[in-house]
């Protein structure tokens, strides 16, 4: 199975299934000398892990990460960092009744058709369980970017179902509040609406989609490799690799179709840019402004409302999903999106440093 790695200089390779023994990652390209401990990674893993509130899946995993290589006496050695998380709360019997049935909206059918064989327990490799290793690896990237460059990467949920957050401007976001509520939402009033919505979804046996934004502040000018490795192209690729993501926007995104040139261009003055419609990326290269990425996640298809599907013999069946599932997968997606943005940014920083370390910029950054 190909497609388990991302990055060129900072690379992350993951393996593991939802109901297997555990999850693993090999993180390569981390510069030596970075102070790093398991506690540094655990912070974001605890933000993502299941069973932390009644608004997400009730599968309870400690998601305790073990660093098994690449760190000595509290610092990275420059060699590959091995990470391990053991699964402890599998309930594979929840899936025994559907081993011969394809769940609609999931990867059961496509995995079976592609490989001729599949792990039906919780979706196997296609389960969002695998994103725990992305978060662990991304925490390494976030720490390097923060410690060495002062880059901050933070996300917040802007929409769940048909309810919206009314706080969008980064300067108005209380990040402590975002990380103190189960929805990673910046709008205190929206949190109560989200709570009611999730409660209703559970009663109705259905689910809903979500939208969230990730913001990277302090990114230096110059990251990105035109033309095929544009920074925004690689960010979009990374975000689309997250389970359930069906849309990615950078800056104003799809809204640019209704804009006009005189108002949508990010004009410049000696004191800085007057706007950030482009989301911090111009010509595939970071401009030094905040990089703003928005993603949309579809409703999970694992719901307690019966639906139609087929079995492995191609026969029509009525499908009812059992097990422990998120009524809205977007609730726990914020640290995953942060991790993927961090992975891309560190990879591009190392690539930029390798080729352009001696470049003398013609003027100081205006941001």
UniProtKB/Swiss-Prot annotation:
InterPro entries: Chorismate_synth, Chorismate_synth_AroC_sf, Chorismate_synthase_CS
GO cellular component: cytosol
Gene3D superfamilies: Chorismate synthase AroC
Bound cofactor: record note: Reduced FMN (FMNH(2)).
Residues that bind FMN: 125-127, 243-244, 283, 298-302, 324
Transmembrane segments: none
An MF annotation (GO) of this entry: chorismate synthase activity
Sites where the protein binds NADP(+): 48
GO biological process: amino acid biosynthetic process; aromatic amino acid family biosynthetic process; chorismate biosynthetic process
Cofactor section: FMNH2
UniProt keyword list: Amino-acid biosynthesis, Aromatic amino acid biosynthesis, FAD, Flavoprotein, FMN, Lyase, NADP
Enzyme class: lyase
EC number per UniProt: 4.2.3.5
Chemical reaction(s) catalysed: 5-O-(1-carboxyvinyl)-3-phosphoshikimate = chorismate + phosphate
Pathway connected to this protein: Metabolic intermediate biosynthesis; chorismate biosynthesis; chorismate from D-erythrose 4-phosphate and phosphoenolpyruvate: step 7/7
Family to which this protein belongs: Belongs to the chorismate synthase family.
NCBIfam families: aroC, PRK05382.1
Oligomer status and interactors: Homotetramer.
Function: This reaction introduces a second double bond into the aromatic ring system.
Annotated protein name in UniProt: Chorismate synthase
Organism: Psychrobacter arcticus (strain DSM 17307 / VKM B-2377 / 273-4)
Designated gene of the protein: aroC
